[in-house]
Design a protein with these regions (language model features):
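Short, conserved micro-motifs enriched in small and acidic residues
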Residues: 21-25, 121-128, 196, 200, ...
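A charged alpha-helical hairpin associated with nucleic-acid processing machineries
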Residues: 186, 222-225, 236, 261, ...
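Extended hydrophobic-aromatic, low-complexity segments
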Residues: 26-28, 43-44, 73-76, 176-179, ...
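Glycine-rich phosphate-binding loops that contact phosphosugars or nucleotide phosphates
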Residues: 10-159, 242-285, 306
């Protein structure tokens, strides 16, 4: 990991993550990681909004940009804004030698390899993983991550490729997702709900469905359902919930019950052996068990596969969705 990112870790007062699209949602997960493991205040901002709101930026702050291409114009402008205020800058990028990598004080490469499809998938996984690694190392330097916790998290990370691979293999060999696509491909609206670490997974899952299948989908914090979205729930608007067994599991069960009470259909991303939730919902998108902090990385995969199968069933171009570009280089 670039030493420039870790230097001065004890003196850091604030981290601002700037990004666009899927990278922004990865940043929301990074906020949870960084605040939990480093106890540094973290803000996540759309890069396209950051420079226009006269942000409060100081030399004791770190501007952390996330951009797959390293060429996203709004993200580069946000980096420049941070530098103009004397803040240190760092970037999580995939393309080696890209503009973001060149202009920032420090860089962490995703090392995800070329991502051919316009809709980001493995770059999201790599970004979230890098954010967790940064949080672990910053936490070590600040004394907020113990040796035991570091070993626990690093050991859990070592299991991640196998778990993700098995998840994808099971999806490819079975017909669960094709059947779901057959069931739902004519629906026009979806609601995605998650809490805590899984709220960003919900909005990312909704974005994937929008991007490649052209179906309107909204991602919401589950606790906000009663503040508006609940008015939309009926037989014509399925709800996708991200509900692994974590600290907010009981809250998610309550939200599922509220959707069902209004004749809503529920698809749940949950642990495959969770018989209790299986009895509450209409369809399961199973995920494996893992460390709580790694669950978002695994939970997003069923949503990616679901969006893919929906797009295929609807005859959409998965790799080149209409009106989208891999790298947005103009405002």
């Amino acid at each position: 990991m670039d030493a420039n990112i870790l230097s001065g870790a004890r003196g850091l007062e604030k981290i601002t993550i700037v990004a666009c699209g899927t990278s922004y949602y990865a940043g929301l997960i990074g906020k949870y990681y960084l605040e939990r493991l480093t106890r540094i205040s973290v803000e996540v901002d759309y890069a396209s909004e950051f420079r226009y709101r006269q942000p409060v930026v100081k030399p004791s702050h770190l501007i952390l940009a996330i951009t797959q291409s390293g060429e996203t114009v709004d993200t580069l402008a946000a980096i420049e804004e941070g530098q103009a205020h004397g803040a240190r800058t760092a970037a999580i990028v995939n393309v080696v030698g890209s503009q973001a990598a060149r202009v920032c004080d420090g860089v962490v490469y995703m090392q995800a390899g070329p991502e051919i499809g316009v809709a980001s998938t493995k770059a999201f996984t790599a970004s979230v993983t890098d954010l967790l690694l940064i949080a672990i190392h910053l936490g070590e330097l600040r004394g907020t991550v113990s040796d035991a916790l570091r070993r626990e998290l690093m050991q859990a990370l070592l299991t991640l490729p196998g778990l993700a691979g098995q998840l994808l293999e099971d999806a490819a060999q079975g017909d669960r997702y094709k059947q779901l696509a057959e069931e739902f491909h004519l629906y026009r609206h979806f609601l995605y709900l998650g809490r805590g670490l899984h709220y960003p997974v919900a909005v990312e899952g909704a974005l994937k469905l929008k991007e490649i299948s052209y179906i309107h989908a909204e991602g919401y914090p589950a606790g906000e359902m009663k503040h508006g979205p609940i008015a939309l729930i009926d037989r014509d608007m399925p709800t996708v919930v991200i509900a692994p067994r974590d600290g907010v599991y009981d809250k998610m069960i309550s939200q599922i019950e509220q959707v069902k009470a209004r004749n809503g259909t529920v698809l749940a991303v949950a642990h495959g052996d969770d018989e209790y939730i299986c009895g509450k919902v209409d369809f399961m998108l199973p995920m494996p068990h893992s460390h709580e902090l790694l669950m978002p990385i695994l939970a997003v995969i069923p949503l990616q596969v679901f969006a893919y199968e929906m797009a295929v069933r609807r005859g959409a171009d998965v790799d080149q969705p209409r009106n989208l570009a891999k790298s947005v280089t103009v405002e």
